[in-house]
Amino acid sequence: FIINKFGYKFFNNNKVLRLLFFTSIRGMSLNKIFKIRNIHFNTFIKKDDEIYDDEKKRIVKEVRKKGYCDITNYIGIKKEEINEVKNYFKSQQLYNGHDPLQSDLKKSDYSEIYNNNSNHEIFNNGYFSYDAETSLNNTVLKNLFYNKKLKQISDLYCGFNTEPYNICTMLNIKKEIKHPVTEYHRDIDDFVSAGFFIFWTKTDKNNGATTYKVGSHIKENVEN
């Protein structure tokens, strides 16, 4: 009602309203969410051609079209930084679910990840995670979380001044399993948002999510 009456920009600029109705979006249909999203995009999408940096322009336009874009070369994470991150998380305790809140809330050491054989749909099913504090205590990740180049892409795509609000680090072992988080699904946290995924190791069908649905950010139904 509020967005229909006053517009998305009014809602987005009002922190009180956003806090009050943060979870309300989960009760809305995809069709209604996409309608609000597309109306917002159409107010500034023509300005994409005015983006002064060619690489930023390419990335934003590709994300608008496909819903995702490989920005490996744009962000330029160094090999030694990748190794540092991997070694860091091997030394930290983790939870036995793809998200700490989707676990039994008990921390364990990295060395124990192959010891759990529960038949629970989510817990001990090959997926593990670290809390946000653990992730942000790593210098490489903290610098990426507040990275100006990533923020610029987010601002240009969303059409307003964005702020990072969540960080999730997930680990999964090589195991032929079916897990709810790797089945095709859509997480809609806001009407307009941008997410950045970093794969610190190689992935395949038994080790990490590897497929994105082209157009699933703007269409309710997409082809397989």
Where are the model-predicted features located?
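Non-heme Fe(II)-dependent double-stranded beta-helix
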Residues: 4-10, 14-65, 71-182
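Hydrophobic side chains in beta-strands
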Residues: 171, 198-199, 212
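Short, charged/polar surface micro-motifs in flexible loops or helix N-caps
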Residues: 175-178, 202-205, 218
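Short, conserved beta-strand element in jelly-roll/cupin
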Residues: 189-205
